[in-house]
Amino acid sequence: MVVKIEVFTSPTCPYCPMAIEVVDEAKKEFGDKIDVEKIDIMVDREKAIDYGLMAVPAIAINGVVRFVGAPGREELFEAISDEIE
């Protein structure tokens, strides 16, 4: 099963580049086991509202918000590994 990762960001968010960087590292590590979608909440506000997000960056894994704020590499990799298993 492919794990779906959604990263919610905004252009003015100072922490969003860190979240994107760690997700990009995860994509390199896990390859085709994960599908990454980067969502700019200024463009796709509805999806953020559907998740009830009040802050960015936020990361949803398989439809569940798992992180608000930029997670550490180990935290994110562990959460992804849990979903793959």
UniProtKB/Swiss-Prot annotation:
Name this polypeptide is given: Probable Thioredoxin
Keywords of this protein's UniProt record, alphabetized?
Cytoplasm, Disulfide bond, Electron transport, Redox-active center, Transport
Which SUPFAM superfamilies does this chain map to?
Answer: Thioredoxin-like
Q: Per its record, what are the GO molecular function terms? A: electron transfer activity; protein-disulfide reductase activity
Show the disulfide pairing.
C13-C16
- Subcellular location per the Swiss-Prot or TrEMBL entry: Cytoplasm
- Give GO BP annotations, semicolon-separated: cell redox homeostasis
What are the residue boundaries of the Glutaredoxin domain, all occurrences included?
2-85
Q: Which Pfam families match?
A: Thioredoxin_3
Q: Which domain of life is it from?
A: Archaea
> Which purpose does this protein serve, as stated in its record?
Does not function as a glutathione-disulfide oxidoreductase in the presence of glutathione and glutathione reductase. May be a component of a ribonucleotide-reducing system distinct from the previously described systems utilizing thioredoxin or glutaredoxin.
The family classification in the record reads:
Belongs to the glutaredoxin family.
Database matches in Gene3D superfamilies: Glutaredoxin
The family database entries (CDD domains) matched by this protein are listed as: TRX_GRX_like (cd02973)
Iron recorded as keyword: no
Q: Which GO terms describe its cellular component?
A: cytoplasm
Location (main, coarse): cytoplasm
